[in-house]
A protein has these predicted regions:
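Short, charge-patterned binding micro-sites
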Residues: 5, 43-64, 95-96
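Short glycine-/aliphatic-rich beta-strand segments at the starts of folded cytosolic domains
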Residues: 6-14, 20
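Structural beta->alpha junctions
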Residues: 14-18, 61-64
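C-terminal binding/interaction regions
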Residues: 23
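A short linear hydrophobic-aromatic micro-motif
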Residues: 40-46, 88-91
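C-terminal structural segments of small proteins and small subunits
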Residues: 60-96
Length: 96
C-alpha cells in the first residue's frame, strides 16, 4: 500500500490588518477551520512579524493521491473565499 503526502503552502495578504494581533486572529481562524473541517496539520510558517502578510501551510497523508489532491484544493478554496484575506501565491505538492 502506498503512502501519499500532500502539502499546500499559501501566501496571503491581510489588507485590513493594522497590527500583529489583527493578523493572528485571521490566521488562527483559517488554521482552526481547516484543522477541524479537513483533519489536516496546519501552521503559519513565514512572515511571522509582518502584520499584513502571512504564509500558512497545510499537510495531509492518505493512501490515495486523488483524496489528497481534492482535500488540499478544498482548503485552497476555503482560504480564497475568506473576505479578510487575499491569496497572493499557492504551491501544492504531492509526494507518493
Amino acid at each position: 500500500m502506498a503512502m501519499v503526502v500532500g502539502t499546500l503552502r499559501i501566501t496571503l495578504t491581510i489588507p485590513g490588518s493594522d497590527s500583529l494581533k489583527d493578523k493572528r486572529q485571521v490566521v488562527r481562524s483559517l488554521l482552526d477551520v481547516a484543522r477541524n473541517r479537513f483533519n489536516v496539520s496546519a501552521a503559519e510558517i513565514d512572515h511571522l512579524d509582518t502584520h499584513r502578510l502571512a504564509c500558512v501551510a497545510f499537510a495531509c497523508v492518505s493512501n490515495d493521491r486523488t483524496v489528497v489532491n481534492r482535500m488540499l484544493n478544498k482548503i485552497l478554496d476555503l482560504v480564497e473565499s475568506n473576505p479578510l484575506c487575499e491569496v497572493v501565491d499557492s504551491e501544492l505538492d504531492i509526494i507518493s
